[in-house]
Amino acid sequence: MHNSSMTSTLSQDDAEIQSPRPHSDVVEVYSAGLVIPITAPSVLDGAIAVSGGRIEHVGSRDWVIHALEQAGCPFVEHHVDGVLMPGLVNAHTHLQYTGMAQVGARRYTGFPSWAQAFDAVYDHTEFDWSAEAARGARLSIRYGTTSAADVVTDPEAASALHDLGLHGVAYWEVMGWSNEDWAARGPASVNASLDAMPTPPQIGISPHAPYSLDAEPLLDLPDLARRRNLRLHIHLGESHSEAEWKEGRTAQLDDLWRSGASTSFTEMRSLGGGFSATQFVDQLGVLGPDCHVAHGVYMTADDRRRLRSRNTAVALCPRSNRVIGLDAPPVAAYLNEGNLLAVGTDSLSSSPSLDVMEDVALLYKIARAQGYGEGDLARRLLHTATLGGAVALGLSTGRQRVGQLQSGAVADMVFFDVPVTTIVDTIEELVQTGASRQIATIIDGSLRWVDPRFSDFFEGDVQ
């Protein structure tokens, strides 16, 4: 058994990822000063027993070891004095844009100025999308992410999660289709792209946004996904243009549908429709428990109600919103009203890093600034970064469940170098300062990344 406590200061480029190793007959016991299962009470001096890539036992260290000894199971223990919790779920990212960090390193005045900077790099730079997506996947593992919602725009980037052994969903992004082009060849094109994507993990469809697709593809894509038993993921409420008009509304959504002037969200807006993008996609049947949305910044109380009614989760990406120059998402309202929440980093083209805990810390500050004063904030935000993300990706139940530490679940975990005091105070410290303090990432029970200064703590003798 080993222990230590030192702060990691590794840079993004130090992500040396280990290959998955074959499962052995020896049970691995991972113990820590505090274990946070998410689906059960946190345990001081806790432990997780792992066998065959799955969790066997969760509880106090003494109980877990006693249970293994009583069963005559050989085991090896790895102990760190910090925190052990489920692997993080990055519920919205674009790993292929890892090479566009120069765009995300700046600040912008709104969506148009950011899009101009993005297009200037995307259109005039030769990228190896496969290599960049793989690098993004490695960085994700370094930051404790074990599952991701990866939006794929170029087919070369489609295999990043598959190749690196990450869980989650790779979503094929669909954008720029007019009604006419879609009718001629859209469904066949999308189906062919989906058929070419490797599995596992799961694949899904990402209709980019209400403003980047005409109405017919937005109407058809949910049906196409559901016939194939695929999940959906859409950017929604990210730009000012998607917000409901507070004044000057001249036409209601139902009126415009009946008039036949419903070729696209943009066209209907130009004809005086003051409805929100959320109302628009809800009318088209996009939302549902098999769909989650990214950003959700410009959402009225009615928009948030619609998301709750459809059991649709929101992946909040506050650092991306800040870089682009958008408002902060209504975090306090989401929490008070009971919306399903997850956390995403977005891509390095609009965010400083792929560390989900950076976004968690910012969400904490935003919620407090917006008046959320309850003492459960830190605990709830840890939930959004783990089980909340699993719910958003459809991975919270069943044999492949993630985002939780419980018997039978996939053994995806992350260690943090955070000093352990009381349970409440340690969780507060983890949420507010846990970014870049990851020690080790375990996927399917296999050690995939470890801070080199802690590497010997993950070796041990069989007992």
Question: Can you say where each PLM-predicted feature lies in the sequence?
Answer:
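Active-site gating loops and adjacent loop-to-helix segments of metal-dependent hydrolytic enzymes
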Residues: 99-131, 169-175, 240-288, 363-370
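Alpha-helical scaffold segments that flank or form the walls of functional sites
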Residues: 83-84, 99-164, 187-198
